[in-house]
């Protein structure tokens, strides 16, 4: 590889790895939620209800679980896009399902999900508004896996023509634990 190609690859790596704080919501300051954020939070709860129903409304055949609202990839995408962006619903499907050739439909993959926020969590939330108008809600969970631990659960919602949709979910360990 020539020196020019090495330089190009190095520059691309720097651009991909070094991002501004706006691209890293965890670096931006948070504020306690106010009633002004409640409409976006209420929509977030509706989106999480879509996720919950996708997982809980299922057929069981032997020890296999099949989503009722997602026999095919297209049907599952359409269902999940009631509460999630197109790209994130695709990521959810990759994480939650696999195609079962024997039954000709999507199968749920057993595993751990993510925390589900409820209306009672509203007063425990913090938020920030991103440059594009999306809202990041954060709830901290403590003492989950071991004494003294702390995790940030962040849900980013954006407003689209069909309402507020979940764009991303992250669960990361707080950097200042131990």
Predicted segments with their positions:
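Bacterial N-terminal signal peptides that target proteins for export
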Residues: 1-7
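Bacterial N-terminal signal peptides
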Residues: 9-17
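Sec-dependent signal peptide cleavage junction
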Residues: 18-28
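Core segments of small alpha/beta cavity-forming domains
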Residues: 32-110
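Surface-exposed, charged secondary-structure patches
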Residues: 100-145
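Short beta-strand edge/turn micro-motifs at domain boundaries
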Residues: 148-178
């Amino acid at each position: 590889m020539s020196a020019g190609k090495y330089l190009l690859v190095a520059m691309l790596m720097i651009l991909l790895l070094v991002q501004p704080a706006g691209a890293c919501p965890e670096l931006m300051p948070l504020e306690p939620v106010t009633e002004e954020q409640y409409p976006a939070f209420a929509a977030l709860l509706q989106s999480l209800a879509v996720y919950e129903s996708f997982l809980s409304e299922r057929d069981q055949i032997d020890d296999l679980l099949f989503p009722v609202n997602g026999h095919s990839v297209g049907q599952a995408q359409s269902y999940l896009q009631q509460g999630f962006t197109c790209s994130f619903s695709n990521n959810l499907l990759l994480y939650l399902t696999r195609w079962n050739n024997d039954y000709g439909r999507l199968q749920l993959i057993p595993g751990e999900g993510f925390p589900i926020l409820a209306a009672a969590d509203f007063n425990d939330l913090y938020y920030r508004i991103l440059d594009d108008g999306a809202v990041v809600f954060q709830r901290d969970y403590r003492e989950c896996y071991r004494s003294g631990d702390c995790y940030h659960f962040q849900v980013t919602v954006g407003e689209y023509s069909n309402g507020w949709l979940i764009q991303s979910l992250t669960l990361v360990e707080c950097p200042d634990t131990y």
